[in-house]
Structures are given as C-alpha cells and as structure tokens.
Curated annotation (Swiss-Prot):
Catalyzes the interconversion of 2-phosphoglycerate and 3-phosphoglycerate. The keyword Oxidoreductase does not apply. Gene3D superfamilies: Alkaline Phosphatase, subunit A, BPG-independent phosphoglycerate mutase, domain B. The keyword Cytoplasm does not apply. It holds the Pfam family iPGM_N. Substrate binds at residues 124, 154-155, 186, 192, 261-264, 336. Mn(2+) 2 binds at residues 13, 63, 444-445. This is 2,3-bisphosphoglycerate-independent phosphoglycerate mutase. Monomer. Keywords: Glycolysis, Isomerase, Manganese, Metal-binding. InterPro entries: Alkaline_phosphatase_core_sf, BPG-indep_PGM_N, Metalloenzyme, PGAM_B_sf, Pgm_bpd_ind. Mn(2+) 1 binds at residues 403, 407, 462.
Length: 512
C-alpha cells in the first residue's frame, strides 16, 4: 500500500448508532455527505462503552475515556475499574496509601474519615468503593470511623439520595463500624469554579462542626427537601448527638477522599490538606498532621498520597509518529481540545516533537443549543488552511457538536449540530482524498442518537451504543471489520506502513 498523505482521523464527538428514528437527531438530520460516505466506502461498527474501553460492563463511554483508548491503541483501564478490581480481588488493604492511612490512625489513636460522592453514578465515585473502604477499616479494627457523604442528584435522579443513605446506614449496621458525621450536596463540597464560599461551607462543617444541624442523615435530607433543595443543593449539615458534632476532622486524623475523578475533588482537598492556602482564612482549629489520601491523582503538585496513581501509557500513537519523524496536527475547538491533545496522548500534557496543535475558541454562549454549529465552520476553515501547507502526515480532528449540543436535551438543536458537521465533512474529506490522503471517520461515544428517554423526556447523557467507522480513500479491495476504539491506532499504523508496538494490544481492522 502506498502511504497516504495525510491520513486523517476525524472524530464526531457523541455520534452513536441506533436503528430507532424517534428521538434520534442523527437519523432525523439531513446529511447528504455522510449518506454518500456510508454508501461509497467500507464501513463497520466499534464498541465505545463498558469493558471495551476499560469501564465496567454496561457503563456508557465518555470523551476522556474514548480519546485515551483511541490514542493508546490498547484498552485503558479506568480508575473506576481498577478500584473495582482491587475490591473484588481483596487487594485494597495492601494498597500503600490506604495502608499508611490506617497505620497513621493506629499510631495516633485518632479517627479515620471517609469522604466522597454517595451514589452509583460511576462518574466521580461509586458507593461500592466506600463499602470496600469500610470493610477494610473493620478488618483493620479501626474504632473511630466517620463518613462524610456528598449527595449527588446530577449523575443520579435529583431526589434519589435517601436510597443511598439507607444503603450506607445498613452497611454501617451490618459491619458494626462507623457513623455518618456530615451530609452535604455536591454543589458545595465539589465546586470546581473557584466559588470558594461554597467550599468554605463544607470545610466549616467538616472541621468546625458548623452549618445546618440534624440528628441523623435522613433528617438532614428531609429538612433540605422541605426547603425545596434537591440532593445536589443540600447545604452542608452537621449531624449532632447530645448537642455535639458526631465527628469533625481533627489533628492527627486521616482522611480518604474516595472520588476518583479529579476536577471536582481539588478545591476541598486544597482547603483541607495543603499547607499553602489563601482562598479563605482557615481557623486555629485547622487540622495539623492530617494524613490525606486522594483515591486518584487530583493534581500532581498537591504532593499528597494517591491510592491509584495514573498508569503510564508507553508507545501511544502520537509518540510513535514522533519517533518515526512524522508531522502530526491536532485540531479542535476549546470544548474538545484537551481530548485531541492531553487525553489522546495518554493523559500527558507534553507535546511531542513534530506535533502541532490548533485551538479554535468555542462560542461564548450560555448553552450550545443557542449556537448548535458551535465553532465547526471555523475549525474547518483553519484545517483547510493547514492542508494548503501540505506538511502533515497525520491529522487528528474533533467535531464537538453532536456531543455538546446533545447534552442540552434540545432535539432541534441537536439535528442542526449534526447537519453542521455533515456540511464541514463535505468540505474537508473530498479535499483530503484529492491530495492523495485517506480518512478514518469515527466517534468516541454515543449521545445525539438518543435525545429522548423511554418516557419521552429529554435524554441528555451519553449512551452505550456502538459508533461508526468509515474508511475513506483506501485502496481497492481493502475493507474494515468490527472492533473497538483501541483498534484505531493499530489500524492507522498499518495504513502508514508502521509496525504496531507490543504495548498496543488493539488489532488492525483492515481486511483484504
């Protein structure tokens, strides 16, 4: 096979496949270009969710996970799955960071605090991970265990917390260990937008025992509902017994924050655990000699113990291109720029030699249904300019529209989003083929193909549906077979005539 120049991987973010037309923005959109590509070129389907991308079975895919798998050429096991495995295999008590936290509590005759999002949403945390930690504390005979549940209502229904609080109370009773000490909504404890007044409310409840008060967790929830505040918005509430807080965070204690997603775990971690902190004034009671464990790495500059540090991905697609002296271009609008750079490169911020990046600003609107085309036309113009330079061997391009507009739940807007992408593909793809290039057209997960749930209400989440793969401009007689996202990098390496490194366990999907 002659080496194409350029070889482009085009990712239509949130573009899944479904036979249903009802609520399917992709089927309802007018897409003459995509229709033509599907008709004229070999196509197949890829798995983009669950175990095929390193998530638990049945878990919908997402953009971070999708791009990690696309760039790594192997299934990248997510923190969620790694923690599940450790619990299933009984290795949690042997984890260094967790073992040290237990030892710290024993040495100081102090308390262990378990804090995290209490739900089975699986996006930031999972209630089973809390249960695994409680079982570990019981096996290790820790006497003082306090739980600080953060209520969800975003990755779960808005008023579903009672179910999870009941499950937690039952688990504590079954194990004969631990008490619930505070209850708060994620709006406060998990803020990520530098609204430090929210973080401070959580801090005050955790450290000072100040805030709303209740005699138990369910009462705390009920008084919040009575004030018309759903799970996410529960004001930090201190559980009191005999007029005293059940358990505040004190000197020499240990905290395990069991959220595995970093972005919403950083602010409260800074406030509780970092020596240098000036977002608000911390009180004299600020805990000294606190052993604070992050379940995953929230920020390497925190220098805190991490239970499940990031896995290093050696010989990803971008790294191999660079070693071979190939020139590569990564291009996307702001919303998906990190995905075609940081995540595609295996969660590494550094740019490889020979890798150029183009960031096109996303439009400044409150929600993207107001501008469903987003910056797709600008991304397209920028790419066409870059094609004129004729210097890139490989291009990685992301169109954000089907995902970001799909999240709004507005069907008409999602249809327009898909049509905008179709129009852009009609300009880009023929141009690449005319240059002697080839295109792999795919997606990272589903979204826009399901805009309605079973009750006919707006559906705003990702899906577990398969995604398409179309191989455009390839040699006569070469097709593609079904696979998973991790098979894309080995497929591209074969097209480029490069060997697949042993670290890549994905398979080339080319058929002859």
């Amino acid at each position: 096979m002659n080496r194409p120049k350029p070889l482009a991987l085009i990712i239509m973010d949130g573009f899944g496949l479904s036979e249903k037309s009802d609520g399917n923005a992709i089927k309802q959109a007018h897409t003459p270009n995509l229709d033509k590509f599907f008709e004229e070129y070999p196509d197949t389907v890829l798995d983009a969710s669950g175990e095929a991308v390193g998530l638990p079975e049945g878990q919908m895919g997402n953009s971070e996970v999708g791009h990690l798998n696309l760039g790594a050429g192997r299934i990248v096991y997510q923190d969620y799955t790694r923690i599940n495995k450790a619990i299933e295999e009984g290795t949690l008590p042997e984890n260094d960071a967790l073992k040290n936290a237990i030892q710290h509590v024993k040495d100081n005759n102090s308390a262990l605090h378990l804090m995290g999002l209490l739900s089975d949403g699986g996006v930031h945390s999972h209630i089973n991970h809390l249960f695994g930690l409680l079982e570990m504390a019981r096996v290790k005979n820790i006497e003082k265990v306090y739980v600080h549940p953060i209520l969800d209502g975003r990755d779960t229904p808005p008023r579903s917390a009672e179910k999870y609080l009941n499950q937690l109370e039952e688990k504590l009773a079954e194990l004969g260990i631990g008490e619930i000490a505070t209850v708060s909504g994620r709006y406060y404890t998990m803020d990520r937008d530098n609204r430090w007044d929210r973080t401070k409310k959580s801090y005050d409840a955790l450290v000072l025992g100040e805030g709303l008060e209740a005699s138990d967790a369910i009462s705390a929830l009920k008084q919040s509902y009575a004030a018309d505040k759903s799970d996410e918005f529960v004001i930090p509430t201190v559980i009191k017994k005999n007029g005293q807080p059940v358990g505040t965070i004190k000197d020499n204690d240990a905290v395990i924050f069991y959220n595995f997603r970093a972005d919403r775990a950083r602010q409260i971690t800074k406030a509780l655990a970092l020596e240098e902190f000036d977002e608000f004034e911390r009180p004299a009671e600020h805990p000294e000699n606190l052993y604070y464990v992050c379940m995953a790495e929230y920020d390497e500059e925190f220098n805190l113990p991490v239970a499940f540090p990031p896995l290093e991905i050696k010989n990803g697609f971008g790294e191999i291109l660079s070693k071979e002296g190939f020139k590569q271009l990564r291009i996307a609008e702001t919303e998906k720029y990190a995905h075609v750079t940081f995540f595609f490169n295996g969660g590494v911020e550094k740019k490889y030699p020979g890798e150029d990046r183009v960031l096109v600003p996303s439009p400044k609107v409150a929600t993207y249904d107001e501008k469903p085309e987003m910056s797709a036309y600008e991304v397209t113009d920028k790419l066409l300019e870059k094609l004129d330079e004729d210097k890139y061997d490989v291009i990685i391009l992301n169109f954000a529209n089907p995902d970001m507009v799909g999240h709004t739940g507005f069907m008409d807007a999602a249809v327009k989003a898909v049509e905008a992408v179709d129009e852009c593909l009609g300009k880009i793809i023929p141009r690449i083929v005319d240059m002697g290039g080839q295109v792999l057209l795919t997606a990272d997960h589903g979204n826009s193909e399901k805009m309605k749930d079973s009750e006919g209400k707006p559906h705003t989440a990702h899906t577990t549906n398969q995604v398409p793969l179309i191989y455009i401009g390839g040699p006569e007689g070469v097709g593609v077979k079904p696979g998973k996202l991790a098979d894309i990098a080995p497929t591209m390496l074969e097209i480029l005539g490069l060997d697949t490194p042993e670290e890549m366990t994905g398979q080339s999907l080319l058929t002859r």
